[in-house]
Amino acid sequence: MAHKKAGGSTRNGRDSIGKRLGVKLFGGQKAYPGNIIVRQRGTKFHPGKNVGCGKDYSLYALKSGIVFFKKKKNKKFINIIPKILCK
């Protein structure tokens, strides 16, 4: 005879993988056209000059230059300063 009753099935044991969101290029780093600067859900960061916004709200560089973060009226903007102006 069995000395233990049958164990019930557990409802745990699942977890989703991380989505790798966040800032990919930080202030002062070089960016080239098409480089992803931020992966995000919603607009935590807004696109500024020379920065585009994808349909999943990812921000990417439109021109080559240096990444520059700026806060304006409680909104965070990301700009790209072109290489010509950086010299």
UniProtKB/Swiss-Prot annotation:
PROSITE patterns: RIBOSOMAL_L27. Keywords: Ribonucleoprotein, Ribosomal protein. The keyword Ribonucleoprotein applies. GO terms for cellular component: cytosolic large ribosomal subunit. Signal peptide: none annotated. One of its GO terms (molecular function) is structural constituent of ribosome. The keyword Lipid biosynthesis does not apply. GO terms for biological process: translation. InterPro entries: Ribosomal_bL27, Ribosomal_bL27_CS. It holds the Pfam family Ribosomal_L27. Belongs to the bacterial ribosomal protein bL27 family. NCBIfam families: L27 (TIGR00062). This is Large ribosomal subunit protein bL27. It comes from Wigglesworthia glossinidia brevipalpis.
